[in-house]
Amino acid sequence: MKFNISNLKAVFAVAALGAASCTANYEDINRNPYEVTGEEMERDGYAMRSFMTTMQSWVVPTDRNQCQFTDVLLGGPYGGYITDANNGFNAGKFSTYDPQSNWSPVFYRVIYTNEMSNFSELCKVTEDENAIAVAKVVKVAGVHRVSDTYGPIPYTQVGTGANPVPLDSEKEVFKAMFADLDAAIEVLTRNRAGMISTDADRVYGGNLERWGRLANSLKLRLAMRIVYTDFTTEDGRTPQQLAEEAVASELGVIADNAGNAMYMGFGKDGNPFYVCFFSFKSGEGDHRIAADITSFMNGYADPRRASYFNEATFSGGGYVGLRNGIRIPDDERINRYSRYNVTASTSLMWMNASEVAFLRAEG
């Protein structure tokens, strides 16, 4: 019996040694040899560049399907600029105020989650204050659109470990966005002659001074949106004071087209608006220009029409928009209406000098 027990102990000892030797290299054995590690991702700032460019690609979504939901099917009709021109959209759409249930959360899901999650990850992989300042501007550029659409959203407690993350009121979101912009403006002004990697920037090619002007311009935009409210920041500044600060800032605001914030960098399909107007539906496009905007511009004989629209192919030509919310007719007729003047290589506009000029005039 003693002999058997001794042998049994020996067996267990060998098994224990074998188990230890197996688990000692467990992570290495189970690591995909064709996949980069976290350490490799951080070399040469690759991870920062990846998170930054991803954030930039979601301010106005560059994915054609997501952009169609957020800016063409939703923003286009409600703004009076774009209408649906595919009779597959004859039921359950934003332009008739009865969107399908799975359409309503898309704007929140694709823009908000991509901006906030990638910002959090970027802050984990870099301590570069310039990169973080630019990322704050990008975050506000994307997320303020989400708050404008839905109102309260999680913002101030994202990344704190709270589960679930509580909603902030729209007032609290605006306070936090102004704080983010102020922090970014301070860094970008102080380091205005500096750069971030051009590979991390598809808007201004790494130019910090231009990012500072965009930050001030966004601050002006947000201030003017709440100028007739009782809003104040944590330190008591009113929207009027915030707007005046932005314009009087050392870097100033976007003042000419050279400073326009325009995203440049698409996949093989090109500009997503081009895809929506010229590629979907066998090349005829799912959308046309809305009658709202063409009626105004035709009424004033606005000289910008040729830059904004393509002429209709009706016998009389001209710029003819399609009414929003109607029952969409057959393709033969619908395809004659004016389309957006956009090409596959046209840059995506975030903010431009003309908007800033109007904001300044309103103030």
Feature map (PLM): residue ranges:
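Sec-dependent bacterial lipoprotein signal peptides
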Residues: 1-20
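Intrinsic-disorder/low-complexity regions
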Residues: 3-6, 24-27, 179
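Terminal low-complexity, poorly structured segments
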Residues: 4, 13, 69-70, 238
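Hydrophobic alpha-helical elements and their junctions with loops/disorder across both membrane
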Residues: 17-20, 62, 191
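Membrane-proximal, proline-rich intrinsically disordered regions
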Residues: 22-80, 110-113, 125
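Structured, solvent-exposed acidic/aromatic patches
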Residues: 42-46, 82-363
